[in-house]
Amino acid sequence: MQIVAIIPARYGSTRFPGKALADLAGKPMIQHVYEQTIRASLVSRAIVATDDRRIADVIHQIGGEAIMTSTDHETGTDRLAEVARGLDADIIVNVQGDEPLIDPAMINQAIEPFLGNPGLKMGTLKSRVKCLHDFLSPNVVKVVTDNNGYALYFSRSPLPFFRDKWQDLKDEAFASGRLLCFKHVGLYVYQRNFLLEYAAMPQTFLELSEKLEQLRALENGIRIRVVETEFESLGVDTPDDLNKAKERMKQG
């Protein structure tokens, strides 16, 4: 089975322009993401997909693979699909270009349900919410799943709504697991052929309402397998996030 990881990376981030090339422990951030990705044992090949020559040059200089893509894509999925069309691959893994601390084991965990399961079209990860701030924050996407580990819904709202335990909404309740809630970890795995279909689907009501692309799949009746991970990554959306990543790396 040919499994290719694609890392979409733009230079023109709204909140943090140039973040893909921001220095993190002596390396551009995108280099950290690429190096962590190729360490995943189930990944056959890793490619950075970018619309900026500077990002491609960084990857080429370390002997990696980067492909220049159109500057007109509205979403990361569109950029992913452009590259996937030209690949001879069975499975495509979408690794976010702003996750320099991603553990290779997380990538393997997301891929594993696809091994020997040709009917599975899309998968992702979740991890425990451990504080009240994350539960309430619209910037932390929550997910609920059925008893078989398939997504029921993703939302920026508190999910689930603990109607009879609202007075118990404290950090300790989440940290101890007394209130069990999960946040979405934005790493996706697709059957290649399904990815191309998915990218061509019109945007949907819930997707546009929540600004969450994965809802397009749910609204079209596609089951999304969600695997729980205990590994903690860190998305870098702002300079402050970059400083947090630097501190995490110092701590080992």
Swiss-Prot record:
InterPro entries: Cytidylyl_trans, KdsB, Nucleotide-diphossugar_trans. It comes from the Bacteria. Its EC number is 2.7.7.38. GO terms for molecular function: 3-deoxy-manno-octulosonate cytidylyltransferase activity. One of its GO terms (cellular component) is cytosol. Pathway: Nucleotide-sugar biosynthesis; CMP-3-deoxy-D-manno-octulosonate biosynthesis; CMP-3-deoxy-D-manno-octulosonate from 3-deoxy-D-manno-octulosonate and CTP: step 1/1; Bacterial outer membrane biogenesis; lipopolysaccharide biosynthesis. The keyword Plastid does not apply. It catalyses: 3-deoxy-alpha-D-manno-oct-2-ulosonate + CTP = CMP-3-deoxy-beta-D-manno-octulosonate + diphosphate. It is found in: Cytoplasm. One of its GO terms (biological process) is lipopolysaccharide biosynthetic process. It holds the Pfam family CTP_transf_3. Keywords: Cytoplasm, Lipopolysaccharide biosynthesis, Nucleotidyltransferase, Transferase. Activates KDO (a required 8-carbon sugar) for incorporation into bacterial lipopolysaccharide in Gram-negative bacteria. Belongs to the KdsB family. This is 3-deoxy-manno-octulosonate cytidylyltransferase. It comes from Trichlorobacter lovleyi (strain ATCC BAA-1151 / DSM 17278 / SZ).
